[in-house]
Structures are given as structure tokens and as C-alpha cells.
Amino acid sequence: MRNKFKPFLIIATIALISATLGLSNVQAEDNPDMKGWEADSPYNQLYDVREYEKIRAWVVRVKEVVPMPGMSPATAIDVREGDEVFEVHLCPTWYRKPSEIRLKKGDRIKLKGAWAEVNGKEVFLASKVKQDPDTTIIKVRLTKDGTPFWTMPPEQLALELKAP
């Protein structure tokens, strides 16, 4: 009797998992907080790997900003490198709130990402932030092409978050 239902249970389980994963992707796309953060949005198209750079800087403050008119808010940090203070965009606040970023004024950090002009202002679009000595604080984009983590399917995101 048990073996008779085994194929049915396997198929039902696979269908349930597939439906759940598909639903989570639809929910992300329909999420009003996603406004301006979609994978193909004008904002995300500003990440240019040719502008990729590694920077060591000091945290000035963690804050919330609206990168472009009509977008939902972003978590950002102001950092100081030498005499220059500039803004670093991390991710949408619904993905990671400023209060969830374990950084404070005076922390020494390493940034990886790309420079971009956003709404008339030169900013750094981060892909990864590490705190000296090499403690990863947040990974938000693929370094190789700038794909935002918040646009990835759950299974791909899980793999990326496990990677060093």
C-alpha cells in the first residue's frame, strides 16, 4: 500500500515546491516596494562593470535615501576616503534596513562596486562591503556583472549568500 502512494507523494511535493518558488518570484515583481529596483530598471542599468573599483574608507554614517525620483528608499552609507566624503548605495531598504547594517561612524571598511552618476550625483554602487579585518557585512550584487541579489530567485540567492 505504501509504495502505491509514493510516486503520488513525490509528484505532489515537487509541484508544491515549484508553486511556492514561482509565487515568491511573482510576489517580488508585484511588490510596490520594488519600484525602481527591478533587474532591468534604469537605476540598476547604471551599474557598469567597467567602472568597478575597490575602495578602503571610513564610515561617516548609515542612512536612508531615495536614489531617483519615484523609487522606493535605499539603504546607503556616507564614507570618507582621504578628504573626500561620498555616498554609497547598498540596496533597497525592504531588502536590508539601515538599522540592520552592522556599521557605525568610524568603522574602517572595504568596498567593492562601481561608480555611477545617479540623479546628477556621482555615487558608488556597492556590490560588497567588508569591515576590516575581512568580515563581510553585506553582499548585494554579483561583482562580475552587478546583478542585484534582491532580483534573484530564492535558490540562486541562497547559493550566492553562502559563497565567500
Cite the ranges covered by each PLM segment:
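OB-fold/S1-family single-stranded nucleic acid-binding modules
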Residues: 116-146
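Sec/Tat signal peptide C-region and signal peptidase I cleavage site
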Residues: 22-28
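OB-fold (S1/OB) nucleic-acid-binding surfaces
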Residues: 68-90
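Bacterial N-terminal signal peptides
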Residues: 11-20
